[in-house]
Amino acid sequence: MLALSRSKYFAFLTGTVGGLLAGVGLSQGGVVFIWISTACLWASMAFPSAVFLWGLFAILLSYRWLLYLHPLTWIGVPIAFSLPIAILIWFSCGLLGGLLVALWSLIGQIPFFQRRLNSSTKDQLLYVIALSLIWGLVEVGLAKSPFFWFGLGDSLLPYDRWLAGLARWFGSGGLAALQLILGWWVWKIIFAFKKGSPWLGLFALGVCSLLLAHCIGWILLADNEFTSSKRIALWQTNIPTRQKFTLRELKRLPISLQDALEEADNLGADWMVAPEGTLSAGQNLLAPSPLPLLSGGFRRVKNKQMSSLLVFNEGSTSYSSAIDKHRLVPLGEWLPSLPGVNWNGLSFVGGVDPGDASRFFDWDGGPLAVAICYELSDGNNLAKAIFDGAEWILAIANLDPYPISLQRQFLALAQLRSIESARNLISVANTGPTSMILSSGKIKSIIEPFNEGVGVIDINVSQKISGYVRWGEIPLISSLLIVLCFIARLKGKA
């Protein structure tokens, strides 16, 4: 009983430390943090409550930018309630993360899996691969939920592009599974070393596998094909969200937009892009646009308000076509409808309705895939747009009032989307990041964060179809079914 109690408390400590390391890895980047943290996760698997702590602290640390929601007085929340509401939202996300990871550990404790955990290393590996694939597929599913999801699959970037290159075959879900398998490898080496068991063979096998995986990833990243080039101007508005609807900013914005269009035209751009939410519903340009404009903004369709990417043709003052945001931010843009209750959400513009799920947008400038803000985390949906013919990816966002840590996570997501789809990606955001991400995952910063300005880039477009775009999660699902069949066969022999 005493030994069990000590094991439990050690698991709690290991889960807490692992979660903190995961939080650092997810928010700052760094594969070493993630591998050690996932090693701690495997070490705590016998105790779901310890695994809960891992998920809790991982989310609390990596999502601490949520606290920058405070103050909420600009949308009418009394100052006395502002910080408690921000803390409640932040802590609720942490609880959700902890519960999800604890549920995953409970799956590993069902008899079908549990017998493999206490058997040979080969059988344990089947158990680990199965649970890792389940985790990876769940991450893909969570990326389709209303919540902004930044998981293990995204944590390789920006520091290990070569290993992340494998996403061109099996996407972010496959990378998440790989991270967990590598964490188990680290844990097995530490466990063997502690017990005085042979570990050099396992260490050498893992290192050789890592080298091979990096070589394959490097080859995949080098395989790019481009058909033509576009010259695009990017306008980073740098308007604080809390000041956007002041009389001063409402007067200044139309003039600043016209000045930016003139500057873009003088720089020889084919068209200009402005961030999410730049234009209010019904707002027109002060003068005919000297070049085509793609601008984030709001529009009303059949008494519904949509957050959209609006297209203004050259010589026009009003938009001619649009694609609407599908994935809305809970509380910020959307709240569940209740009888007799009209929710506006935590937004000055009020509630927003979702558009079509497809991110494919075909306009006069050529087909592209559009991600508005958090839609960038759904690689599966963007891959469908690429398969439908999109030649590049445009991500527009407004990440104010959040700090630079969220911008780093957003850029990591942008890198992964570029790698998965073999497409160049442009990110244009209110306060940043405003960058171009090459299909190899390399980042070219165009405008420094928290500065206003217009920058011009040349983007190469492509019609190449990557393995992930073609097959999606089919390889992961097939691999999981095969591993489960092997486990069932071993169970039958036992």
From Swiss-Prot:
The keyword Lipid metabolism does not apply. It is found in: Cell inner membrane. CDD domains: ALP_N-acyl_transferase. The keyword Hydrolase does not apply. It is an enzyme of class 2 (transferase). Gene3D superfamilies: Carbon-nitrogen hydrolase. One of its GO terms (molecular function) is N-acyltransferase activity. GO terms for cellular component: plasma membrane. It is a multi-pass membrane protein. Its EC number is 2.3.1.269. The chain crosses the membrane at residues 16-36, 41-61, 62-82, 133-153, 173-193, 202-222, 468-488. Keywords: Acyltransferase, Cell inner membrane, Cell membrane, Membrane, Transferase, Transmembrane, Transmembrane helix. GO terms for biological process: lipoprotein biosynthetic process. Residues 235-461 form the CN hydrolase domain. Belongs to the CN hydrolase family. Apolipoprotein N-acyltransferase subfamily. This is Apolipoprotein N-acyltransferase. The lineage of its organism: Bacteria, Bacillati, Cyanobacteriota, Cyanophyceae, Synechococcales.
